[in-house]
Regions:
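Cys/His/Pro-rich metal-binding microdomains
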Residues: 168, 181
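Extracellular calcium-associated, cysteine-rich motifs in secreted modular proteins
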Residues: 187
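Processing junctions and N-termini across compartments
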Residues: 164, 174-177
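Short Cys/His-rich "knuckle" micro-motifs
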Residues: 176-179, 190-193
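Charge-rich, low-complexity N-terminal segments
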Residues: 1-164
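Positively charged, low-complexity intrinsically disordered regions
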Residues: 166-167, 190
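Cys/His-coordinated zinc-binding microdomains
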Residues: 171, 184
Length: 198
């Protein structure tokens, strides 16, 4: 079964090297849908709490909200950094409070302080799906991601090979030590009983 959560993201980008209107800097409101698949966790009677999917995903997705997303070889990128530096906002501003976790992967790098994401490839709906899956695949059992932006849409299905160990008290994934990061419940494999962490 699947738990499904959606996010709205406002961002600006352009298709560097593209022949058409998208070569100009422009903005979108995109809708990202993440479907998490697993068995129903008997303790909480759900696959995965949607509010916990939102918290887990939003930690990295907020880097894309109200952000400028440019390809790493886009010649406008140095000019943007220069203007941000002249404005004194390259390293952050007092009112930039919605910063996500910085990340650097093969596909993209986030600069949360200045609301900038630099990508390896042009930021299309397909590209966004690749980046999001890469960032979240170890945190959630993602079965499908759909991203719509303007009149563009793409979706991709992913194989979910094994069940994720989850807390029977609140339904979220256990950490590498078998402890729930939210309530402290511990998976005690030796006795088969769960108990609060000490």
């Amino acid at each position: 079964m699947r738990s499904i959560t959606t996010f709205d993201l406002q961002y600006a980008h352009r298709f560097y090297g593209f022949c058409g209107e998208a070569q100009y800097l422009h903005g979108h409101t995109g809708t990202l849908t993440i479907e998490v698949e697993d068995s129903i966790n008997a303790g909480v009677n759900m696959v995965f709490p949607c509010n916990e999917i939102q918290k887990t995903a939003w930690d990295v997705l907020k880097n894309f909200d109200h952000a400028l997303i440019l390809r790493e070889d886009d010649p406008i990128l140095p000019a943007i950094r220069q203007v941000y530096s002249q404005q004194g906002i390259l390293n952050g501003a007092p009112h930039n409070e919605m910063k996500g976790e910085a990340f650097c992967t093969e596909l993209a790098r986030a600069y949360p302080e200045c609301r900038l994401v630099v990508t390896k490839e042009t930021m299309t709906v397909e590209g966004m799906i690749k980046i999001v899956y890469d960032l979240l695949r170890d945190k959630l059992n993602i079965a499908r991601i759909t991203f719509t932006s303007g009149v563009n849409a793409a979706t991709e299905e992913f194989d979910v090979e094994e069940s994720m160990r989850r807390c029977p008290m609140c339904g979220i994934a256990l950490d590498e030590n078998g402890v729930c990061p939210k309530c402290g419940w511990r998976d005690n494999r030796t006795t088969g009983l769960g108990e609060p962490a000490v």
